[in-house]
Protein backbone atom coordinates (compact mmCIF):
# COMPACT_ATOMS: atom_id res chain seq x y z
CA UNK A 1 0.00 0.00 0.00
CA UNK A 2 2.76 2.47 0.88
CA UNK A 3 4.30 2.23 -2.61
CA UNK A 4 0.99 2.13 -4.48
CA UNK A 5 1.76 5.37 -6.33
CA UNK A 6 4.80 4.03 -8.19
CA UNK A 7 3.21 0.62 -8.82
CA UNK A 8 0.16 2.22 -10.45
CA UNK A 9 2.37 4.30 -12.74
CA UNK A 10 4.40 1.26 -13.82
CA UNK A 11 1.24 -0.79 -14.38
CA UNK A 12 -0.40 1.90 -16.53
CA UNK A 13 2.59 2.29 -18.87
CA UNK A 14 3.25 -1.48 -19.04
CA UNK A 15 -0.31 -2.22 -20.16
CA UNK A 16 -0.13 0.65 -22.64
CA UNK A 17 2.97 -0.89 -24.25
CA UNK A 18 1.59 -4.44 -24.04
CA UNK A 19 -2.19 -4.15 -24.64
CA UNK A 20 -2.75 -7.91 -24.51
CA UNK A 21 -1.10 -8.24 -21.09
CA UNK A 22 -3.33 -7.65 -18.08
CA UNK A 23 -2.07 -7.41 -14.52
CA UNK A 24 -4.33 -8.26 -11.58
CA UNK A 25 -2.80 -6.19 -8.77
CA UNK A 26 -4.21 -6.12 -5.24
CA UNK A 27 -2.92 -3.58 -2.73
CA UNK A 28 -2.47 -4.72 0.85
CA UNK A 29 -0.08 -4.28 3.75
CA UNK A 30 3.38 -5.82 3.60
CA UNK A 31 2.92 -8.22 6.51
CA UNK A 32 -0.13 -9.91 4.98
CA UNK A 33 1.43 -9.83 1.51
CA UNK A 34 4.46 -11.89 2.56
CA UNK A 35 2.20 -14.32 4.43
CA UNK A 36 0.17 -14.88 1.25
CA UNK A 37 3.32 -15.40 -0.81
CA UNK A 38 4.50 -18.11 1.57
CA UNK A 39 1.28 -20.13 1.19
CA UNK A 40 1.18 -19.72 -2.62
CA UNK A 41 -1.88 -17.46 -2.60
CA UNK A 42 -0.03 -14.99 -4.83
CA UNK A 43 2.83 -15.42 -7.31
CA UNK A 44 4.47 -12.00 -7.30
CA UNK A 45 4.78 -9.17 -4.80
CA UNK A 46 6.25 -5.66 -4.83
CA UNK A 47 7.78 -4.86 -1.46
CA UNK A 48 10.23 -2.72 0.47
CA UNK A 49 12.38 -5.63 1.64
CA UNK A 50 13.76 -8.96 0.52
CA UNK A 51 12.61 -12.29 1.86
CA UNK A 52 14.37 -12.89 5.16
CA UNK A 53 16.38 -16.03 5.96
CA UNK A 54 13.46 -17.82 7.62
CA UNK A 55 11.11 -17.13 4.70
CA UNK A 56 13.73 -18.16 2.14
CA UNK A 57 14.42 -21.39 4.03
CA UNK A 58 10.69 -22.19 4.21
CA UNK A 59 10.25 -21.71 0.45
CA UNK A 60 13.40 -23.70 -0.28
CA UNK A 61 12.00 -26.67 1.65
CA UNK A 62 9.00 -26.46 -0.67
CA UNK A 63 11.36 -26.50 -3.67
CA UNK A 64 10.60 -22.91 -4.52
CA UNK A 65 13.34 -20.51 -5.60
CA UNK A 66 11.93 -16.95 -5.66
CA UNK A 67 13.70 -14.29 -7.71
CA UNK A 68 14.35 -10.76 -6.43
CA UNK A 69 14.42 -7.76 -8.75
CA UNK A 70 15.61 -4.51 -7.13
CA UNK A 71 14.31 -1.55 -9.11
CA UNK A 72 14.47 1.63 -6.98
CA UNK A 73 15.68 3.30 -3.82
CA UNK A 74 12.99 5.13 -1.87
CA UNK A 75 12.88 6.43 1.69
CA UNK A 76 10.72 6.89 4.74
CA UNK A 77 9.72 10.56 4.76
CA UNK A 78 8.66 12.52 7.83
CA UNK A 79 6.19 15.39 7.57
CA UNK A 80 5.03 17.92 10.16
CA UNK A 81 2.53 20.73 10.58
CA UNK A 82 3.49 24.03 8.92
CA UNK A 83 3.48 25.73 12.33
CA UNK A 84 5.74 23.16 14.01
CA UNK A 85 8.76 24.79 15.62
CA UNK A 86 11.31 22.22 14.45
CA UNK A 87 11.90 21.10 10.87
CA UNK A 88 15.27 19.35 11.33
CA UNK A 89 16.40 16.65 13.77
CA UNK A 90 19.48 14.59 14.34
CA UNK A 91 19.02 10.92 13.58
CA UNK A 92 19.48 10.11 17.28
CA UNK A 93 16.83 12.65 18.33
CA UNK A 94 14.31 11.16 15.91
CA UNK A 95 14.95 7.56 16.97
CA UNK A 96 14.57 8.63 20.60
CA UNK A 97 11.23 10.35 19.88
CA UNK A 98 9.99 7.34 17.92
CA UNK A 99 10.70 5.03 20.84
CA UNK A 100 9.63 7.23 23.76
CA UNK A 101 6.35 9.10 24.24
CA UNK A 102 7.98 11.53 26.73
CA UNK A 103 8.70 13.99 23.90
CA UNK A 104 4.97 14.69 23.59
CA UNK A 105 5.07 14.03 19.85
CA UNK A 106 2.39 11.95 18.14
CA UNK A 107 3.42 9.81 15.16
CA UNK A 108 0.89 8.98 12.46
CA UNK A 109 1.23 6.12 9.97
CA UNK A 110 -0.99 4.68 7.29
CA UNK A 111 -1.17 1.03 8.34
CA UNK A 112 0.06 -0.75 11.44
CA UNK A 113 1.06 -3.79 9.32
CA UNK A 114 3.02 -1.83 6.73
CA UNK A 115 6.67 -2.16 5.81
CA UNK A 116 7.19 1.27 7.37
CA UNK A 117 6.02 -0.14 10.71
CA UNK A 118 8.50 -3.02 10.45
CA UNK A 119 11.37 -0.62 9.74
CA UNK A 120 10.41 1.61 12.67
CA UNK A 121 10.27 -1.38 15.03
CA UNK A 122 13.80 -2.30 13.96
CA UNK A 123 14.97 1.28 14.56
CA UNK A 124 13.57 1.48 18.09
CA UNK A 125 14.23 -2.20 18.88
CA UNK A 126 10.73 -2.93 20.16
CA UNK A 127 8.22 -5.68 19.27
CA UNK A 128 5.23 -3.31 19.04
CA UNK A 129 4.61 0.33 18.30
CA UNK A 130 4.42 2.53 21.43
CA UNK A 131 1.21 4.24 22.47
CA UNK A 132 2.05 7.58 20.84
CA UNK A 133 1.58 6.05 17.35
CA UNK A 134 -1.74 6.35 15.53
CA UNK A 135 -2.61 4.25 12.48
CA UNK A 136 -5.02 5.82 9.99
CA UNK A 137 -6.82 4.35 6.99
CA UNK A 138 -5.04 6.18 4.15
CA UNK A 139 -2.27 8.61 3.26
CA UNK A 140 -4.92 11.27 2.69
CA UNK A 141 -6.02 10.90 6.33
CA UNK A 142 -2.38 11.14 7.44
CA UNK A 143 -1.96 14.42 5.53
CA UNK A 144 -5.21 15.83 6.97
CA UNK A 145 -4.20 14.86 10.52
CA UNK A 146 -0.81 16.55 10.17
CA UNK A 147 -2.40 19.73 8.84
CA UNK A 148 -4.66 19.87 11.91
CA UNK A 149 -2.19 18.93 14.69
CA UNK A 150 1.00 20.88 15.44
CA UNK A 151 2.51 18.17 17.68
CA UNK A 152 2.13 15.34 15.14
CA UNK A 153 4.65 13.86 12.71
CA UNK A 154 3.45 11.83 9.74
CA UNK A 155 5.44 8.87 8.44
CA UNK A 156 5.01 7.99 4.75
CA UNK A 157 6.96 6.58 1.84
CA UNK A 158 8.62 9.40 -0.08
CA UNK A 159 7.09 8.13 -3.34
CA UNK A 160 3.77 9.67 -2.22
CA UNK A 161 5.25 13.18 -2.54
CA UNK A 162 8.33 12.62 -4.69
CA UNK A 163 7.06 13.79 -8.07
CA UNK A 164 7.79 17.52 -8.12
CA UNK A 165 5.68 17.96 -11.28
CA UNK A 166 2.57 16.56 -9.58
CA UNK A 167 -0.14 19.05 -8.61
CA UNK A 168 -0.95 16.80 -5.64
CA UNK A 169 2.66 16.92 -4.42
CA UNK A 170 2.82 20.69 -4.71
CA UNK A 171 -0.47 21.03 -2.83
CA UNK A 172 0.64 18.75 0.01
CA UNK A 173 4.08 20.34 0.41
CA UNK A 174 2.47 23.79 0.51
CA UNK A 175 0.52 22.68 3.58
CA UNK A 176 3.03 20.55 5.53
CA UNK A 177 6.78 20.60 6.21
CA UNK A 178 9.07 17.86 4.94
CA UNK A 179 11.49 17.21 7.81
CA UNK A 180 15.26 16.93 7.46
CA UNK A 181 17.44 14.41 9.31
CA UNK A 182 21.15 14.10 9.94
CA UNK A 183 23.03 10.90 9.33
CA UNK A 184 23.84 8.86 12.45
CA UNK A 185 26.57 10.66 14.45
CA UNK A 186 28.00 12.61 11.52
CA UNK A 187 25.69 15.59 11.02
CA UNK A 188 28.73 17.87 10.71
CA UNK A 189 29.73 16.08 7.52
CA UNK A 190 26.44 16.29 5.61
CA UNK A 191 24.21 18.53 7.70
CA UNK A 192 20.45 17.92 7.70
CA UNK A 193 19.08 16.07 4.70
CA UNK A 194 15.67 15.65 3.14
CA UNK A 195 14.87 12.50 1.14
CA UNK A 196 15.39 14.15 -2.22
CA UNK A 197 16.61 12.03 -5.11
CA UNK A 198 20.21 13.22 -4.85
CA UNK A 199 20.30 12.35 -1.14
CA UNK A 200 19.16 8.78 -1.85
CA UNK A 201 22.36 8.28 -3.83
CA UNK A 202 24.95 6.58 -1.60
CA UNK A 203 22.26 6.48 1.11
CA UNK A 204 23.11 9.92 2.46
CA UNK A 205 19.56 10.27 3.82
CA UNK A 206 19.43 7.84 6.78
CA UNK A 207 15.98 6.27 6.24
CA UNK A 208 16.39 4.98 2.69
CA UNK A 209 14.97 1.62 1.63
CA UNK A 210 15.11 -0.52 -1.51
CA UNK A 211 12.05 -1.48 -3.54
CA UNK A 212 11.80 -5.02 -4.91
CA UNK A 213 9.73 -7.20 -7.18
CA UNK A 214 9.75 -10.79 -5.87
CA UNK A 215 8.54 -13.52 -8.23
CA UNK A 216 7.77 -17.00 -6.90
CA UNK A 217 6.46 -18.78 -10.00
CA UNK A 218 9.77 -20.17 -11.23
CA UNK A 219 8.76 -19.62 -14.85
CA UNK A 220 8.65 -16.95 -17.53
CA UNK A 221 5.23 -15.35 -17.40
CA UNK A 222 3.53 -11.95 -17.32
CA UNK A 223 4.91 -11.35 -13.83
CA UNK A 224 8.50 -11.81 -15.01
CA UNK A 225 7.71 -9.61 -17.99
CA UNK A 226 6.44 -6.87 -15.67
CA UNK A 227 9.54 -7.15 -13.46
CA UNK A 228 11.79 -6.91 -16.53
CA UNK A 229 9.83 -3.88 -17.75
CA UNK A 230 10.24 -2.08 -14.41
CA UNK A 231 13.99 -2.77 -14.43
CA UNK A 232 14.30 -1.76 -18.08
CA UNK A 233 14.81 1.68 -19.60
CA UNK A 234 11.16 2.77 -19.63
CA UNK A 235 10.39 1.45 -16.15
CA UNK A 236 13.48 3.12 -14.73
CA UNK A 237 12.53 6.45 -16.29
CA UNK A 238 9.17 6.16 -14.52
CA UNK A 239 11.07 5.64 -11.26
CA UNK A 240 13.21 8.70 -12.00
CA UNK A 241 10.16 10.82 -12.82
CA UNK A 242 8.53 9.75 -9.52
CA UNK A 243 11.40 11.30 -7.57
CA UNK A 244 13.03 8.02 -6.55
CA UNK A 245 16.50 6.73 -7.39
CA UNK A 246 16.48 4.13 -10.19
CA UNK A 247 18.55 1.01 -9.58
CA UNK A 248 19.59 0.94 -13.24
CA UNK A 249 20.35 4.41 -14.53
CA UNK A 250 20.41 4.92 -18.28
CA UNK A 251 23.07 7.07 -19.88
CA UNK A 252 22.05 10.54 -21.04
CA UNK A 253 24.25 12.66 -23.28
CA UNK A 254 24.13 16.45 -23.08
CA UNK A 255 25.29 18.74 -25.85
CA UNK A 256 26.72 22.09 -24.71
CA UNK A 257 26.93 25.00 -27.13
CA UNK A 258 27.69 28.68 -26.80
CA UNK A 259 24.09 29.43 -25.84
CA UNK A 260 22.00 29.49 -22.65
CA UNK A 261 20.11 26.36 -23.73
CA UNK A 262 21.11 22.79 -22.91
CA UNK A 263 20.00 20.14 -25.38
CA UNK A 264 19.51 16.50 -24.44
CA UNK A 265 20.68 14.56 -27.49
CA UNK A 266 20.00 11.06 -26.24
Map each language-model feature to its residues:
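Pocket-flanking alpha-helical
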Residues: 31-62
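Exported/periplasmic ABC-transporter solute-binding proteins
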Residues: 1-19, 23-26, 38, 67-72, ...
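Generic hydrophobic, aliphatic-rich segments that mediate packing or membrane embedding
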Residues: 33, 72-74
Amino acid sequence: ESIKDIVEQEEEIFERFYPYARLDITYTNERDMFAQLLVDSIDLIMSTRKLNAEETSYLSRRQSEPRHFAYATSAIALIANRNAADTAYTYEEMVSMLGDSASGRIFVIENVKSGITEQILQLINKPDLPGHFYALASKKEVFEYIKAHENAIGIIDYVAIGDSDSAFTREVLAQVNLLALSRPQDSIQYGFLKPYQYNLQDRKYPLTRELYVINNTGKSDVGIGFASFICGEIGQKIVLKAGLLPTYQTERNLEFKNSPDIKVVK
